[in-house]
């Protein structure tokens, strides 16, 4: 195997901005690009290899071809030919909807799908940009529905003004929303299931409001209240600092100032590198980039 690169899958959205195209140095005239799916095994939205002998193969093709060699023995035993993670960049010019994602058991029961635990890493943020994560006070499922109906659900959500480098872990069941001006990297389980709770009563280009999933979301929500929903860490020059470790992924951040060497020979898994700022080159032991 050699270091694999993938073609981005660009998604135009109602709320998309203009940061993704220049951030990725892409030659595209697309407007309102809200998401760039960097690595995806989602059906009908599969990433395509952009380099090397396997150029043109989809991620699903690669998993079928290389099996444990690509994803590791434990991952292949657990997920088979389904790639378990979805990596995105998200650029919000407007507030995204208030939403929640189901956990594995509920997603399997309702959709025959994985659940959706995820995390955010803030790449960039306009002045005053905010993220919402979790409840700021205890509410019941009945109160939740009442607040959705009377447009006050945002009053009981915890808001954070953000800056580059901020991290939030979002286990399935945690209500959340990305605010206008936020540009983030999102690491998540391979699932595109979203229960939209509140959408600020906005309308699309055809004058229609988007469907809400009030009752589906009510059963999926974890109503627990935490003191702080942010992930605290301190970056260390040229050393990995762990951000999140959960049953679905482990993430670390490198604040790089010089060339580093990483030995993954004993790791029974794949590794994904995301460059958040500046530029970098990745080479394997044979000099392949």
Question: What label would you give each PLM region?
Answer:
Residues 261-262, 278-283:
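Short beta-strand segments in beta-sandwich/barrel cores
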Residues 105-106, 167-177, 184, 192-193, ...:
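Histidine-centered metal-chelating micro-motifs
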């Amino acid at each position: 195997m050699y270091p694999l690169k993938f073609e981005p899958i660009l998604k135009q959205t109602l709320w998309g901005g203009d940061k993704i195209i220049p951030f990725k140095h892409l030659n595209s005239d697309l407007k309102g690009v809200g998401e760039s799916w960097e690595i995806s095994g989602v059906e009908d939205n599969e990433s395509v290899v952009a380099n090397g002998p396997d150029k043109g193969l989809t991620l699903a093709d690669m998993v079928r071809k290389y099996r444990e060699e690509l994803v590791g023995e434990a991952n292949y035993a657990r997920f088979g030919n389904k790639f378990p993670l979805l990596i995105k960049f998200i650029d919000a010019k407007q507030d995204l909807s208030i939403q929640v994602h189901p956990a594995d058991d509920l997603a399997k029961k309702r959709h025959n799908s994985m659940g959706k635990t995820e995390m955010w890493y803030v790449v960039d943020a306009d002045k005053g940009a905010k993220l919402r994560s979790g409840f700021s006070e205890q509410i019941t499922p009945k109160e939740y529905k009442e607040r959705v109906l009377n447009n006050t659900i945002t009053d009981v959500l915890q808001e954070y003004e953000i800056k580059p480098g901020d991290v939030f872990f979002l286990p399935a069941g945690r209500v959340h929303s990305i605010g206008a001006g936020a540009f983030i990297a999102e690491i998540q389980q391979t699932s595109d299931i979203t229960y939209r709770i509140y959408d600020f009563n906005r309308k699309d280009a055809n004058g229609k409001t988007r469907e809400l999933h009030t009752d589906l979301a009510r059963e999926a929500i974890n109503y627990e209240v935490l003191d702080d929903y942010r992930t605290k860490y301190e970056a260390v020059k040229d050393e990995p600092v762990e951000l999140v470790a959960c049953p679905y992924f482990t993430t670390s951040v490198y604040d790089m100032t010089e060339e580093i060497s990483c030995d993954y020979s004993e790791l029974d898994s794949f590794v994904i590198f995301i460059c958040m700022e500046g530029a970098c080159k990745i080479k394997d032991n044979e000099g392949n980039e």
